[in-house]
From Swiss-Prot:
This is N-acetylmannosamine kinase. Pfam families: ROK. It catalyses: an N-acyl-D-mannosamine + ATP = an N-acyl-D-mannosamine 6-phosphate + ADP + H(+). Homodimer. It is an enzyme of class 2 (transferase). Zn(2+) binds at H156, C166, C168, C173. Gene3D superfamilies: 3.30.420.40. It comes from the Bacteria. CDD domains: ASKHA_NBD_ROK_EcNanK-like. Its EC number is 2.7.1.60. PANTHER family: N-ACETYLMANNOSAMINE KINASE (PTHR18964:SF169), ROK (REPRESSOR, ORF, KINASE) FAMILY (PTHR18964). NCBIfam families: NactlManKinNanK (NF047821), PRK05082.1 (NF003461).
Amino acid sequence: MTTLAIDIGGTKLAAALIGADGQIRDRRELPTPASQTPEALRDALSALVSPLQAHAQRVAIASTGIIRDGSLLALNPHNLGGLLHFPLVKTLEQLTNLPTIAINDAQAAAWAEYQALEGDITDMVFITVSTGVGGGVVSGGKLLTGPGGLAGHIGHTLADPHGPVCGCGRTGCVEAIASGRGIAAAAQGELAGADARTIFTRAGQGDEQAQQLIHLSARTLARLIADIKATTDCQCVVVGGSVGLAEGYLALVEMYLAQEPAAFHVDLLAAHYRHDAGLLGAALLAQGEKL
């Protein structure tokens, strides 16, 4: 059975056909509508899926935000603008006449990464460190989504009670410090206004402030991982995202995690999928996981 997988992100929409063999075929991409209106998103999704839907038997959506009862929510509703409560599942069912499921994109990516692991792993946590910090938890071989879709939003756990205000409304979240956006926001002086990519480049050139910002991010993530180990007793943590996979970053996280007591140590792995983990994870879940 072929799945029409869709990934809805803040800047792009992607879709592809994924067969039972897990191979991604006929991938297509469009920019996410800037207007944040239901009509614009529906039209964009229609244009994206119309060439593909005749070749699929079901639809699986991985989306930014919180998915609750098939609709789109967010920790900070202002981030969604007019898309708050957008009926993702109902919309795609109407557009395609196919059965449809929807899940948070980081949760979907966690499931894809879990399926790629070797060995007898039943408990793992996936963390993506990119513009924000998100994640997904697999416990006992099952992906945790929670009754309200919130499970795995580990970037919004507390890192520093005196830290910066996070977009979710809390103060001192991991995301506000460790994410690419958090790294850039903390930059001062000649680095003020630089994005995370530039800061990583400057760190590689020996810039002391840039190095300190990246170390702060890595140390914050290591402490989060220690907390996750204490909470879930997971067998491994998989780290992805543009920051998480940046050269030298995971080694820094490992260094800071090693400074924690031994009980909180856990194997760290780089993500298997650099791209399209959300697409693949949603399709894999549609093959047999009850959401």
